[in-house]
Each structure stands twice: as structure tokens, then as C-alpha cells.
């Protein structure tokens, strides 16, 4: 195909728009979804996850995160133009139609559903509330005072699904990890919301940063503390090897650095602090990986 032909240019433009809707150029959301899923897979499989299961969760996570981003932009299409960080998104620029976004969301969800084929029926069953949470979260910002809590539930469902896929059951340690991840998500997404707080107040969007008001930093740190405490409880429940416990002082240091950074409440610093949570996910994965190695 001639790269200068109208058809090629049209297809290139659509592909660019769809990839931007999916946040394909911003992998942080996928990583923050993958880390807890990997924690669960490694714990449930004693450090040796089945490759087919690992591939299904990795690809499925990318697809569902992408679908969530598309439906989020659809839900926020009337607001994104008024927010500094989102004013260049496809809907805000008038580059995409509502029908296109809905069809793309459906297509991505269909592809994600195909990833369930090699998994057991319990995992299929648990995918239904996960799908519901992922697709409805963007609309909670209109009426729920802490939508980040709802997002935490959506971002944590990969954990019980992973345990279900490996062992065909969801033991107590899965729910401890689930609750810990809800708190971690609430912490880092509140920091994310702090970056948009001024704009959200103007347009009337509800976020945890708006709801917590001047206590937003305290709320973030309480959630971080609860997350780390529950990870310690999890370690005790599973009889974690020494390597697991090395993560706690490292994570506490990273959390303190986040506290020192967000005290300024500067928009860009809050956004960079949100991105830094990828390190916490990586540290805990490394600790869990090492635990499964040394516990054998």
C-alpha cells in the first residue's frame, strides 16, 4: 500500500487514535495491574506458574486495562477538555466518535475473554464481576465520593482470579492480598487525583483527593501504611521466607519519599510520585519471587 495514499493515511490516523485511547504509549497502568496479578500467580503456584496461565493473565491484563482506558475516555468526554492533563486526548480534540470508542471497548473485551479459554470455570465466573467493575468505574466519578476505592476493587480482581486459575479455589491469603492491593490502589490513585484536583473542583468531578480535602496526604499515607501492614500479615500467614521480609523496609523508605514529595502538592510532582509506585510493585514481586525460591 502506498504510504501517501488517502486510505493509508486514514488507517494510520485511526490506528494512532485507537492506540492513544488505549494508552498504549503509557504502560504504567498495565504495570500497576500486572504487579499484584503476578504476586498472586507466584504465590499460588509456589513460584512456578504455568506458562499458558501466565500468558493468559499478562495478555488479558493489557487488554482489559486498554478497554478500561477507552471506556474512561468515553465517560469523561465532556470533561477532559477542561483538565490540563487530559485536554489533548482524542475525545477532547474531537478526533473520535462515541460509536468508535464503544466498538473498540467491546472488541478489546472480546479479545480478553478469549484469554480465559485455557483457564478453569471458577476463573471464568470471577471474570464477570471483574468486567463489571472495570467498565463501570469511570461513571462512579459522577456520584461516588471516593471512586478510587471502586477502582481499587477493579484493579484487585486479578488476584482472586489468579488463585482460582492455579488452584481452583480462593484461599484466605488471596483475600488478604486483595485487600492490601485495594489500599495500595487507593493510595497511589489519590496521589494521581491530587495532580488534577484544581481542575476537578472546577468541573465538579468527584475524586478521593477532592473528598479528603486538606487531609488528602494523611489519607494517602494511612492507605500506604495499611497496605504494608497487610503485606506483613500475609507474610505471617504463608510462613514467608526471610527474603520476603526484606521488602518491608525498602517499601517503607519508598513510601516516605512519596510523602516528602507530595507535601508540596505541585501538580507535576504528584504525577511523578504516582508513577513511582511502579517501584513498590517491583520490590514486592522481587520479594515474593525470592520467597518462593528460598521456601523450597
UniProtKB/Swiss-Prot annotation:
GO terms for cellular component: plasma membrane. CDD domains: PT_UbiA_COQ2. It is found in: Cell inner membrane. The keyword Metal-binding does not apply. One of its GO terms (molecular function) is 4-hydroxybenzoate polyprenyltransferase activity. Pfam families: UbiA. It is a multi-pass membrane protein. Gene3D superfamilies: UbiA prenyltransferase. Keywords: Cell inner membrane, Cell membrane, Magnesium, Membrane, Transferase, Transmembrane, Transmembrane helix, Ubiquinone biosynthesis. It catalyses: all-trans-octaprenyl diphosphate + 4-hydroxybenzoate = 4-hydroxy-3-(all-trans-octaprenyl)benzoate + diphosphate. The chain crosses the membrane at residues 28-48, 51-71, 102-122, 143-163, 174-194, 212-232, 233-253, 274-294. It comes from the Bacteria. InterPro entries: HB_polyprenyltransferase-like, Prenyltransferase, UbiA_prenyltransferase, UbiA_prenylTrfase_CS, UbiA_sf. Pathway: Cofactor biosynthesis; ubiquinone biosynthesis. Its cofactor is Mg(2+). PANTHER family: 4-HYDROXYBENZOATE POLYPRENYLTRANSFERASE, MITOCHONDRIAL, PRENYLTRANSFERASES. Catalyzes the prenylation of para-hydroxybenzoate (PHB) with an all-trans polyprenyl group. Mediates the second step in the final reaction sequence of ubiquinone-8 (UQ-8) biosynthesis, which is the condensation of the polyisoprenoid side chain with PHB, generating the first membrane-bound Q intermediate 3-octaprenyl-4-hydroxybenzoate. Belongs to the UbiA prenyltransferase family. This is 4-hydroxybenzoate octaprenyltransferase. It comes from Neisseria meningitidis serogroup C / serotype 2a (strain ATCC 700532 / DSM 15464 / FAM18). The lineage of its organism: Bacteria, Pseudomonadati, Pseudomonadota, Betaproteobacteria, Neisseriales. The gene is ubiA.
Amino acid at each position: 500500500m502506498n504510504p501517501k495514499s488517502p486510505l493509508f493515511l486514514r488507517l494510520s490516523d485511526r490506528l494512532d487514535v485507537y492506540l492513544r485511547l488505549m494508552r498504549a504509549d503509557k504502560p504504567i497502568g498495565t504495570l500497576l495491574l500486572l504487579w499484584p496479578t503476578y504476586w498472586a500467580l507466584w504465590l499460588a503456584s509456589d513460584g512456578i506458574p504455568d506458562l499458558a496461565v501466565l500468558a493468559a493473565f499478562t495478555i488479558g491484563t493489557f487488554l482489559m486495562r486498554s478497554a478500561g482506558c477507552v471506556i474512561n475516555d468515553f465517560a469523561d468526554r465532556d470533561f477532559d477538555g477542561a483538565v490540563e492533563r487530559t485536554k489533548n486526548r482524542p475525545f477532547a480534540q474531537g478526533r473520535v466518535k462515541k460509536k468508535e470508542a464503544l466498538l473498540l471497548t467491546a472488541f478489546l473485551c472480546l479479545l480478553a475473554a478469549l484469554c480465559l479459554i485455557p483457564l478453569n470455570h471458577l476463573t471464568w465466573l470471577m471474570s464477570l464481576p471483574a468486567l463489571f467493575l472495570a467498565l463501570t468505574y469511570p461513571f462512579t466519578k459522577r456520584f461516588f465520593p471516593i471512586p478510587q476505592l471502586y477502582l481499587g476493587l477493579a484493579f484487585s480482581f486479578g488476584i482472586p482470579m489468579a488463585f482460582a486459575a492455579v488452584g481452583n479455589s480462593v484461599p484466605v491469603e488471596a483475600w488478604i492480598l486483595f485487600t492490601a492491593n485495594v489500599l495500595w490502589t487507593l493510595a497511589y490513585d489519590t496521589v494521581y487525583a491530587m495532580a488534577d484536583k484544581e481542575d476537578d473542583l472546577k468541573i465538579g468531578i468527584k475524586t478521593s483527593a477532592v473528598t479528603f480535602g486538606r487531609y488528602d496526604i494523611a489519607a494517602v499515607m494511612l492507605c500506604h501504611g495499611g497496605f504494608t501492614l497487610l503485606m506483613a500479615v500475609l507474610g505471617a500467614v504463608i510462613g514467608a521466607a526471610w527474603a520476603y521480609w526484606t521488602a518491608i523496609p525498602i517499601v517503607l523508605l519508598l513510601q516516605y519519599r512519596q510523602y516528602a514529595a507530595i507535601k508540596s502538592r505541585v501538580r507535576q510532582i504528584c504525577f511523578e510520585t504516582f508513577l513511582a509506585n511502579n517501584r513498590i510493585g517491583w520490590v514486592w514481586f522481587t520479594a515474593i519471587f525470592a520467597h518462593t525460591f528460598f521456601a523450597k
